[in-house]
Amino acid sequence: MLRRIALLLTGVLLLCTLSFAQERTKINDKAAGNKLLGRHMLSLQWISWDYFGRVNVTNKGGVYYLKGEQKGRGNTDFVRVEGVITRIDAKEFWFDGKVTTQVSHINDGMPCVRDGEDIVFRITGKRKYWRMTEIDNPCDAVADYVDIYFR
């Protein structure tokens, strides 16, 4: 009887664990997936195009994670990205996570958070970076250019 209960509990725990597991990143272009892995420069134009931040993309069990930050020099400005890449195509990737910006002259210097599942970064033309496509700042009437550069 105890054995049956133990097996039942083990099965329930396993099912719960699997239901909360992150789905693997859907890679529709292997070369683009490889290009995205590793360390990249990160920028928000309000902070600097001279002093870049860093973002790191890792693959853990088939799930691509993105995390990084650019900080202003001599102030509290920053852009921070963190989350999971859900899909990778040849010229764009989809991101499920947070993009937080804080710039002294925007939104009264308070943080502005974009939190969502379908944040898209895209390569256009001959650019050497992925740019976040939703450039309209949801907290103020400005455009944010959040860029992740090729290695």
Each model region followed by its residue ranges:
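An anionic, turn-rich surface loop/hairpin at beta-sheet edges
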Residues: 95-125
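N-terminal secretory signal peptides
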Residues: 22-84
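A short, structured loop/turn motif at beta-sheet edges
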Residues: 59-61, 85-94, 121-127
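Bacterial N-terminal signal peptides that target proteins for export
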Residues: 1-9
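Short, solvent-exposed aromatic-acidic interface loops
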Residues: 71-72, 98-106, 134-141
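Short hydrophobic/aromatic-rich beta-strand segments that constitute the beta-sheet cores
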Residues: 64-68, 93-97, 128-134
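Bacterial N-terminal signal peptides
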Residues: 8-17
